[in-house]
Each structure stands twice: as structure tokens, then as C-alpha cells.
A protein has these predicted regions:
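Histidine-centered, transition-metal-coordinating active-site segments
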Residues: 1-62, 67-75, 82-83, 104, ...
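A glycine- and small-aliphatic-rich helix-loop capping segment at beta-alpha/alpha-beta transitions
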Residues: 101-114
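Short active-site segment of divalent metal-dependent hydrolases/proteases
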Residues: 96-100, 195
Length: 375
């Protein structure tokens, strides 16, 4: 089967604000825009699964998205699809992730639920590229890339996936469940899963949470015992099976082994008591930051100078953020529930921890705080 998108290329290449294209082409331009953005740069200091700031060889969020990009590009080459589109979707798919990985996402989601909202990183990644980058202006990406970002949903591992080829109002998507409009987006959705299963297992071994001999036999035999072997097996399987199935798909034996590995990872890694101990710290950090910043905003609103009264760098930086984003939030006509979450979700792990210190530990009199006071 030849994979072709049943949706007009002009729709896929459409931007919310018309612009003259250049020699990079539609989708490679999106790739460079994402790479140059601040949210992409911050991914190198955001947890993937393991909070391990002292170990340079444990996967961070930026390494994960690079794995997704290379896997997606390889599959697109094999299947005759648009590599540039897949690269852009891959690099942008996790820009909306919270600090401290999926645990941080759940914490922010619970905080927003109390105010009638939700925090879902797939949806939030679209908010980042559409609005939060460039002080409310966004990156002005193509429809195809925006669609692939919001529909990448990497948690459910389906054996076969097909695009819906629908032109959707992406801003109205409020829950998971939508499928990509393109084959390239579907490839990224599959590659997201391929990228994390073996790598999470390998990192867990390095951190001594599990041992090599703990890996189920069916996984070692059919997929491999190292991340590189697992990726190689899955990429080759998808490349050979997909044209026959008319879908981005895995064979039955490989899919069985994949689901075994996924169950193993959940039982022995993601729900490991050692990690659960860290989760309590992350909940205290993010909940405290949310409560403090929400209180500040409810007291001072957009009166930026009043944030000086708090006498800490977090409040001053938050005020500076509000000042730069004022036009965007002002045009929302209220509904500021997401405003504090926008700021916290953009934090790196280290910045969140430093911010807690700012509001919990007083500075000495010789500190340089005064030069940052907003005037």
C-alpha cells in the first residue's frame, strides 16, 4: 500500500497568520521555529521519568523528543512519507509538559480540576505553540504540525493506527481521543511509544531499580535486552507490517512482547516505591507554588509594581512574565484560571525547586534583590 494523505495539502500547510514561505519549506520552517523557541530549550532540564539531576546519562525530556524525531524520520523514509513534517511534530509534541514528568502533569491537572479545568500535556503543547511562545504571538505553525502535536497521545499503545483525515478545529479539542489528520502524525504517535519503552527500562537498570535478569523472557527474545535493540526491532517490524495492513502497525508476536514490556515497566518502574517517594516532594513543590502565585495574582492582578511587596525573585519574575504577556491575557476577558498554570508548567525542574527556596527561605540583607525591583 502507498500511504497518501486524504486531505488537501493546502489545508495541511495553512498557517493561522499568512506568511511568505522561504527556501526551508513549510514543515522544516516549523522545525527551526520550534528549535529556536524557549520552551524547547527548557526541555533539557525537565524530567522524562526519572528525576536524576546528578546523572548525565538518564533520559531527559529533550532527549526523548529527539528519539521520537529520529524514529519518526526513519519510519517516514521507509514508508515514503514527509520526513520534515514528522520532525516538526516530534520536536513540538512535548513542549507543554510540566516539570517533573507525568507526575507533574497529574498534579497540575488536579489543581485545575478544583477550578473546573484540566491540564493535559497534549492539549497544552498546542497552547504553547499557538499562544505562549513569543509573548502571546505563538510560532504560527502549519495546521499539519499543530494537529500532530495535539493528537500525539503517547500513553495508549494500539497495535494498529490510522489517521482520521479530518480538518478539525484544534482549539476546541478538550479531551484525548482525537486521531491525527495525517499519516505522519500517526507515525509520530507510534514513535512516541517506541521511544520510551526500552529507554525507561534501560534507565531503570542504570539506577538499579531493576536488574537485567528481571526483564521478561518474551521481551528479551522478541525485542531485545537493550534500548537500541528494542528500537531496531520495532522500527523494522512497523516498516514491514504497515504496508500490508494499510495502517501504522505492529505484528502480533511483536505487539504481544511490547504489551508485556509495558506491563513490566508499569509494575516495576513507574509504580516503584522509590519513585513514589519523590512524587510526594513534587506534589508539595507544585502545590505550594500554585497557591502562592495564585494568591499573588488575586491580590495584585496586573499592577506589576505591587509584586515588589513580596520581596522575592519568584514574585518579581512572575510579574515580569505577566507584563510581557499582558496583551494576551487581557484579550481573554477574564478566565484567568490557566494563567498561573501557564507559568508553572513552563518551569524546569530546577527552576521549580529554586522558586520554592525563594518563598520559603529568606534572603540575607546583602542580597542583590533590590536591583530587580520593578519600577
Amino acid at each position: 500500500m502507498k500511504f497518501e494523505n486524504k486531505i488537501d495539502q493546502k489545508i495541511l500547510q495553512r498557517r493561522e497568520r499568512p506568511r511568505e514561505e522561504d527556501l526551508r519549506g513549510y514543515y522544516f520552517r516549523d522545525t527551526t521555529a520550534i528549535i529556536h523557541s524557549y520552551p524547547f530549550r527548557r526541555l533539557k532540564h525537565k524530567t522524562q521519568v526519572f528525576f536524576s539531576p546528578k546523572n548525565d546519562h538518564i533520559c531527559t525530556r529533550i532527549e526523548h523528543v529527539m528519539h521520537v524525531a529520529t524514529i519518526s524520520a526513519t519510519l517516514c523514509k521507509a514508508l515514503g512519507l514527509d520526513v520534515d513534517m514528522a520532525w516538526a511534530i516530534s520536536l513540538g509534541h512535548d513542549l507543554g509538559h510540566a516539570p517533573f514528568g507525568h507526575v507533574g502533569e497529574k498534579i497540575l491537572d488536579n489543581l485545575l480540576k478544583e477550578r473546573g479545568g484540566r491540564f493535559i500535556h497534549e492539549l497544552y503543547s498546542l497552547r504553547v505553540v499557538d499562544h505562549l511562545v513569543n509573548y502571546g504571538k505563538g510560532l504560527n505553525l502549519t495546521y499539519a504540525v499543530r494537529d500532530g502535536i495535539i493528537t500525539h497521545c503517547g500513553e495508549q499503545f494500539e497495535q494498529e493506527m490510522r489517521p482520521d483525515f479530518e480538518y478539525k478545529n484544534l482549539k476546541k479539542i478538550k479531551t484525548l481521543g482525537s486521531y491525527p489528520a495525517t499519516w505522519e502524525g500517526t507515525v509520530v504517535r507510534m514513535a512516541d511509544k517506541v521511544a520510551y519503552l526500552g529507554r525507561d527500562m534501560e534507565d531503570a537498570i542504570q539506577l538499579k531499580l531493576i536488574r537485567n535478569e528481571d526483564i521478561p523472557g518474551i521481551v528479551s527474545k522478541r525485542l531485545g535486552s537493550k534500548n537500541s535493540e528494542i528500537i531496531d526491532t520495532l522500527v523494522n517490524d512497523i516498516s514491514s507490517v504497515s504496508p500490508r495492513k494499510g495502517a501504522i502497525a505492529l505484528s502480533d508476536p511483536v505487539y504481544e512482547a511490547v504489551m508485556t514490556l509495558k506491563s513490566f515497566n508499569y509494575d516495576h518502574i513507574y509504580e516503584n516505591p522509590t519513585l513514589a517517594g519523590y512524587h510526594k516532594f513534587f506534589e508539595r513543590i507544585l502545590t505550594t507554588l500554585y497557591g502562592y502565585l495564585l494568591e499573588c495574582f488575586e491580590k495584585y492582578g496586573f499592577d506589576f509594581q505591587k509584586y515588589n511587596q513580596e520581596r522575592n525573585m519568584l514574585s518579581l519574575r512572575f510579574a515580569d512574565y505577566l507584563k510581557k504577556m499582558h496583551d494576551f491575557y487581557k484579550n481573554m476577558n477574564g478566565g484567568f484560571d490557566n494563567l498561573v498554570i501557564d507559568y508553572i508548567a513552563g518551569m524546569t525542574d530546577d527552576y521549580a525547586i529554586d522558586s520554592i527556596k525563594e518563598i520559603m527561605i529568606p534572603r540575607n540583607l546583602e542580597s542583590q534583590l533590590e536591583k530587580f525591583i520593578i519600577t
